[in-house]
Amino acid sequence: MKTAFNRRTVILAAALGAGTTLLQACGGGDDEPQRNIVELAKNTPELSILVEAVVAADLAATLSTGTLTVFAPTNAAFAALLTELGVSKEALLANKPLLTAVLTYHVLGSTVARADVPLGKAITPVSGGFFKIESNNGLKITDGRNRVSTITATDIQASNGVVHLVDRVLLPADKDIVATASALPDFSILVEAVVAAGLASTLQGTGPFTVFAPTNAAFAALLTELGVSKADLLANTALLTKVLTYHVVPARVLKAEVPVNTAITTVQGQSFTVNSSLVITDQNMRTSSIVATDVFTSNGVIHAVDKVILPK
């Protein structure tokens, strides 16, 4: 009699296309010992590069024990990564620090089945950092560099955990809040303000922080509201510091984790609220809309807002 595991592998093979055989030679007896994650990968042709990488990074023993969840990139995912990074497979496998950082970013220190995935919330792998998974025409992972990967197969059982297949290698964040904002043209005035207020080093620190980041249009509207020039605003470091720190929360808060209609305390000390439509009400009862969410950084997350919020 075929095992339930064998039935699953047939389904997964069909999902990945005709001619691709996942988890070959799984055996047919109900009493056959279940393979661990590394053994499972070794018997899966589509994971052969992953196995090479695990061996090169000296992670085989680690992934053979414990209780783990592995988001396993397929060979096609690794091929795409090599093109993206502009390196050969040999060069990647020889870079043990990078390889270790990337591979451990795909591993959770507990078993998380498909049904238990905390959708939209921060997921912390054993490497540190975070990513999120959302249900959007399938399960999508957004990694630390805001790249998106699709989970193509789920709940492949191993003796020491579970494996989910992904079609793109996940990469941990490599830019802090200031560097991330600096790379986005719509935050250029915000970056000028952060530098002028002497807050750059703080927002480059460990964190984590959540920044409700005003766009350039938001700053332009503020200048009109206050009747000052940009130069005047940037020169008023006391006001700048008070206003900017009111946009920073000393914790990582993703969109799905924002407490609705509950006071959110900022680094500045005062609070604001966010309603279910992602509209912020500040201390002066002025409102601002969150227009983009969950821009990930190495030390937190950025949400863009269309109006500068003001403390009392």
Give the location of each predicted region.
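Mature, structured domains of secreted/extracytosolic soluble proteins
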Residues: 2-6, 12, 16-19, 23-312
